[in-house]
């Protein structure tokens, strides 16, 4: 079943539609990984979205058991930029985010949220990563123009009800993505990549699919993978010492070489169309014991009262000493 899901996801990413925004699907990680955070600490979205871009997060410094609070994830990028879609056309970027909470924390229900929190999350559909990991939250894809910031409503656990939870400082891991990735779920390259020369040599010809695969000579058509059988796909032929080498370039990336140009193996033959990327941040979150807060307030009040009494006592002594001097 997992293989079928991955195949369907790859198909959706590659085919796309003409004017729809480029997709950012954190759900691909959900289908391929039991846990989206690797042992190294890296969130797996970075495995497909290779470009690094900033992510911002606002997390409360401390919360108490049962408190409903919000985590705000900022996904900044230049709204004037567009990137290539799967069919080679240009479109806006979608965004997505992953929040890895400490175990015991979970997504707040609508009934648990305040009216303000309901309004902040009204246009977002947030889901737990899985039944086994309700502390990991996913959202996306969402239109990036309207969702530069995403709000996650969260409920803090109560150690009295869950013995596995303790009053202590925890770590929250947050990943934010914008735009399509460079690696498809099946491991193949998307068209949101730089394509490079397969060998050292000279570019001798460029064959282009104008409408369908029949536009190419049979020997070149056989080289085109199914996901690249689209108008605008090009097959570049290079004359090398080892014979003729070919490179299939899907629609989207723009060629930066011309027929007759000499290239070295690994030289870029297209521009880099990617304008998106993934960012990850970490924040501390303290689960505070309200009893400790009460005792702290009582201690501070006692200190303040003691200081006040000392000041009054000092004034009293000064007055007595002044009276004795006058007497």
From Swiss-Prot:
* Needed co-factor(s): heme
Q: Which GO terms describe its biological process?
A: photosynthesis
Q: Supply the name of the protein.
A: Cytochrome f
Q: Where is the signal peptide?
A: 1-24
- Cofactor notes: Binds 1 heme group covalently.
Top-rank taxon, per record: Bacteria
Keywords attached to this Swiss-Prot or TrEMBL record, sorted alphabetically, are: Electron transport, Heme, Iron, Membrane, Metal-binding, Photosynthesis, Signal, Thylakoid, Transmembrane, Transmembrane helix, Transport
The gene it comes from is petA
Q: How does it assemble?
A: The 4 large subunits of the cytochrome b6-f complex are cytochrome b6, subunit IV (17 kDa polypeptide, PetD), cytochrome f and the Rieske protein, while the 4 small subunits are PetG, PetL, PetM and PetN. The complex functions as a dimer.
**What family does this chain come from, according to its entry?**
Belongs to the cytochrome f family.
- The residues that the entry says bind heme are 25, 45, 48-49
MF annotations from Gene Ontology: electron transfer activity; heme binding; iron ion binding
Coarse class of the protein's main subcellular location: membrane
Q: Where in the cell is it found?
A: Cellular thylakoid membrane
Tell whether Transit peptide is among the UniProt keywords. no
Q: How does it sit in the membrane?
A: Single-pass membrane protein
What InterPro entries is this protein classified in? Cyt-f_TM (IPR024058), Cyt_f (IPR002325), Cyt_f_lg_dom (IPR024094), Cyt_f_lg_dom_sf (IPR036826), Rudment_hybrid_motif (IPR011054)
Q: Which SUPFAM superfamilies match?
A: Cytochrome f subunit of the cytochrome b6f complex, transmembrane anchor, Cytochrome f, large domain, Rudiment single hybrid motif
A GO-annotated cellular component: plasma membrane-derived thylakoid membrane
């Amino acid at each position: 079943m997992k293989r079928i899901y991955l195949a369907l996801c790859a198909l959706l990413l590659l085919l796309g539609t003409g004017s729809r925004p480029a997709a950012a699907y954190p759900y691909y990680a959900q289908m391929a990984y039991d846990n989206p955070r690797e042992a190294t600490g890296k969130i797996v979205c970075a495995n497909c979205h290779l470009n690094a871009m900033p992510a911002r997060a606002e997390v409360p410094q401390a919360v108490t058991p049962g408190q409903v609070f919000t985590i705000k994830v900022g996904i900044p990028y230049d709204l004037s930029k567009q990137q290539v879609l799967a069919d080679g056309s240009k479109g806006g970027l979608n965004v997505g985010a992953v929040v890895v909470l400490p175990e015991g924390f979970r997504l707040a229900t609508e009934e648990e949220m305040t009216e303000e929190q309901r309004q902040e999350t009204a246009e977002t559909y947030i889901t737990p990563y899985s039944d086994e990991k309700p502390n990991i939250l996913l959202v996306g894809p969402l239109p990036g123009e309207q969702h530069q910031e995403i709000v996650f409503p969260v409920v803090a656990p109560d150690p009295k009800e869950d013995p596995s939870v303790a009053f202590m400082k925890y770590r929250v891991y947050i990943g934010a993505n914008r735009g399509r990735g460079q690696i498809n779920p099946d491991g193949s390259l998307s068209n949101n990549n730089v394509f490079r020369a397969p060998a050292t040599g000279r570019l001798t010809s460029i064959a282009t699919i104008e409408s369908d695969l029949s536009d190419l000579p049979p020997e070149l058509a056989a080289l085109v993978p199914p996901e690249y059988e689209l108008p605008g796909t090009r097959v570049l032929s290079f004359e090398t010492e080892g014979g003729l080498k070919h490179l299939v370039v899907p629609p989207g990336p723009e060629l930066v070489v011309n027929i007759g140009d000499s290239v070295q193996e690994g030289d870029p033959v297209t521009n880099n169309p990617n304008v998106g990327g993934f960012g990850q941040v970490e924040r501390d979150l303290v689960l505070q014991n309200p009893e400790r807060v009460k005792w702290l307030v009582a201690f501070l009040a006692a200190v303040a009262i003691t200081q006040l009494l000392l000041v009054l006592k000092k004034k009293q002594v000064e007055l007595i000493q002044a009276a004795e001097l006058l007497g």
